Amino acid sequence: MTKEQASKLINDLRLKLNEWAKEYYVLDNPSVDDAEYDKTIHQLLDLENQFPELITSDSITQKVGGIVSDKFEKHTHKYPMLSLGDIFSWDEFINFNKQVAKVTGTENNEYTAELKIDGLSISLIYKDGVLQKGVTRGDGKVGENVTTNVKTIKSIPLSIPSKDEIEIRGEVFLGKKEFAKINEERLLNGDQLFANPRNAAAGTLRQLDSKIVAERNLDAYLYYYFNENNPINTQFDSINQIKNLGLKINKETKICKTLEEVKLYIEYYTEKRNELDYEIDGIVFKLNDKKLQEEVGYTAKTPKWAIAYKFPAEVKQTKLLDIFPTVGRTGKITYNAKLEPVQIAGTTVSAASLNNAEYIMAKDLRINSIVKVKKAGDIIPEVISAIKDEKFDLLPIWEKDVQCPACNELLEKTSTEVDQFCVNFNCPAQILRSLEHFASRGAANIVGLGGQTIKKLFEEKLITNIADIFKVEEHKENIINFEKFGEKSFENLIASIKESKNNSFEKTLFGLGIRHVGSKTALTLAQIYKNIDNLKNATYEELSSIDSVGEVLAMSIVDWFKIESNLQLINELKSFDVNFEYLGQAKNTESTISEKSFVITGTLSESRDYFKDIIELNNGKVIGSVSKKTDYVLAGENAGSKLTKAEELNVKVINEEEFFAILKGE
């Protein structure tokens, strides 16, 4: 390869990797998996090693990894948060150890072995015993200040038993069960699913709304300790010191005193990782002795004394038995793979989403071909590719459907979208999906009106649109004769339907199933327009000017209100007294501060309105003056006369950290 050819290829790879890095670190929505990213960056590294004169300071290989978002306040790290080099085989670990041995003088090096949590790196800064800041890694030099969100994580204490200035680093993550729960809720709400727990954790921690963060049970394992007043001799001592301060460490961390112990650790967790409650994508090995770490040193990007051993994705081969389409509530066609059952990452996989026709054609997937399958993020089944052997060429090339599988109408596809759509508003599959969506937990939340019950009611023609749900009481004699449905079940169903009439406007709006209007957008629209009539009369120009709406969504809303049957539906729902007025945000009546009164005084880390909003959303109240009936005085610096009066009346005075601890139930 000539230098000119290498230069062009290097530039192409850098552009591709920079785009992927933005998707991964900023948008939390990667378009490629880790294996593809790792393969491409190693290709770039190999080329730069061959042509070192082509290395530039802005190459992604010279960066730590992240990109700093402009959504949060910036924070410059006192000590750079470096990334780790990675390896994929035992031979590569042997080579890594030999490089370390050139400095230590022996290949019998002692390493700490730490499971590589698939999450988001975090730095916690404590001063005078109090958590001052929580900061993401960012680009390694500058991170994002996400302190308010970090304070909602139950495993991160707001105070520690030390007055020193201490920095503790670790990983914020979501457990497998919590990840599944969040994706289940997003599915019900019509939101895009998170691809893996790492994306979910990153997307959560970098939320602008800390109330959403608090609702998701983020967790954290800590592993790095910096304290200039109390230097630590080994990495394992560092972990024990973190534990002694009351922070959470991973109990699977071990010291490996020989290469044989390193190898056994790798083999054990390669086999057992699917049994853990959280996702890991490898193992981090660190030279245990801190003095030796400094002697071995650093590159501009990584420590030379640590390495990340990455697990290979478990890939299995199986037969692609069929490709079939399904119709969503908006008419979107999703293609699915029926697979010969195969065990992957601890579970049986017999189906996978194939997204859209372009996805299938790009991979040239054919029915009855042998395909490679893995689990993206060890969670979601994914068909990677077809095995193109001599039998493959004999199979017919797959062709996309041109008619809706439910109503036989011709499918349509716009030039700006990759998906096909059924545009028949009377399509039975769309109607059924829309009924299920309206009754779902994220929308009307009608208990007893699950998928099977709705399907039965629809098949019996007892309900044919959303408004018919509110006429179900008329069909009592038919419904109580359904299998597993008696008098009591019917009474409970009717009670839940009646209760749903009083739902918030945003829930009802979301339940209408307007294309692209998820639960968050529905809340934004409800807050701005206050009722359905104002929204109905909103122009495209008004809607598209809203930051979180944009042009595509604005057009979708305007188009929805142009359809006569949709206007009839709204009028009919109004006739059943379904609420279409914005009532304000719901309060958490089960909170630890519910019905408690607060006086806020002094200077706090956030504005007075910020704390007032939190208190009121948790069904507490903020009052202007201190009395004997006051439950708490939340006091910051320079609190003044209100603090003095609280002390005189023996009213409990709390600081900001104590406030969050009470809120978390500690």
UniProtKB/Swiss-Prot annotation:
GO terms for cellular component: cytosol. The active site is at K116 (n6-amp-lysine intermediate). The keyword DNA repair applies. InterPro entries: BRCT_dom, BRCT_dom_sf, DisA/LigA_HHH, DNA_ligase, DNA_ligase_AS, DNAligase_adenylation, DNAligase_N, NA-bd_OB-fold. Keywords: DNA damage, DNA repair, DNA replication, Ligase, Magnesium, Manganese, Metal-binding, NAD, Zinc. Its cofactor is Mg(2+); Mn(2+). Disulfide bonds: none annotated. One of its GO terms (molecular function) is DNA ligase (NAD+) activity. It catalyses: NAD(+) + (deoxyribonucleotide)n-3'-hydroxyl + 5'-phospho-(deoxyribonucleotide)m = (deoxyribonucleotide)n+m + AMP + beta-nicotinamide D-nucleotide. GO terms for biological process: DNA repair; DNA replication. Zn(2+) binds at C404, C407, C422, C427. Residues 588-666 form the BRCT domain. Coiled coil: none annotated. NAD(+) binds at D34, A35, E36, Y37, D38, S83, L84, E114, R137, E171, K286, K310. Belongs to the NAD-dependent DNA ligase family. LigA subfamily. HAMAP family: DNA_ligase_A. DNA ligase that catalyzes the formation of phosphodiester linkages between 5'-phosphoryl and 3'-hydroxyl groups in double-stranded DNA using NAD as a coenzyme and as the energy source for the reaction. It is essential for DNA replication and repair of damaged DNA. NCBIfam families: dnlj, PRK07956.1. This is DNA ligase. It comes from Mesoplasma florum (strain ATCC 33453 / NBRC 100688 / NCTC 11704 / L1).
